[in-house]
């Protein structure tokens, strides 16, 4: 009985996500993603046009939303 209880406790600990980390898209060209650090709690996206021939899109993780950027706080929300 003790073995069964111990097994259940171990399985519960392994299955629980004890330190949730956010996952954000990190590339402007494709859907590459990365797991954020524990202190990074938002995904960001910023698009800007430095010249007439193209657009640059920045995506990634941040600890707070940079001014002027679009941010969200769920996995893969910054596409």
Swiss-Prot record:
Classification via CDD domains? TFP_snake_toxin
Write out the tissue specificity statement of the associated record.
Answer: Expressed by the venom gland.
Q: Indicate where this protein is primarily found.
A: secreted
Q: What keywords is this UniProt entry annotated with?
A: Disulfide bond, Neurotoxin, Postsynaptic neurotoxin, Secreted, Signal, Toxin
- For this UniProt entry, which residues form the secretion signal? 1-21
Tell me any Pfam family this protein matches: Toxin_cobra-type
Q: Which cysteines are joined by disulfide bonds?
A: 24-43, 36-61, 65-71, 72-77
Q: Give the top-rank taxon of the lineage listed in the UniProt record for this protein.
A: Eukaryota
Give the GO cellular component terms, alphabetically: extracellular region
Q: Which InterPro entries match?
A: Snake_3FTx (IPR003571), Snake_toxin-like_sf (IPR045860), Toxin_cobra-type (IPR054131)
**Similarity comment:** Belongs to the three-finger toxin family. Short-chain subfamily. Orphan group XVIII sub-subfamily.
Name of the featured protein = Neurotoxin 3FTx-LI
Q: What is the phylogenetic placement of the source species in the record? A: Eukaryota, Metazoa, Chordata, Craniata, Vertebrata
């Amino acid at each position: 009985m003790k073995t069964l209880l111990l097994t259940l406790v171990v399985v519960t600990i392994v299955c629980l996500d004890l330190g949730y980390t956010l996952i954000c898209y990190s590339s402007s060209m494709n859907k590459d993603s990365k797991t954020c650090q524990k202190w990074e709690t938002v995904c960001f996206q910023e698009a800007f046009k430095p010249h007439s021939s193209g657009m640059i899109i920045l995506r990634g993780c941040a600890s707070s939303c940079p001014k002027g950027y679009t941010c969200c706080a769920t996995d893969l929300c910054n596409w």
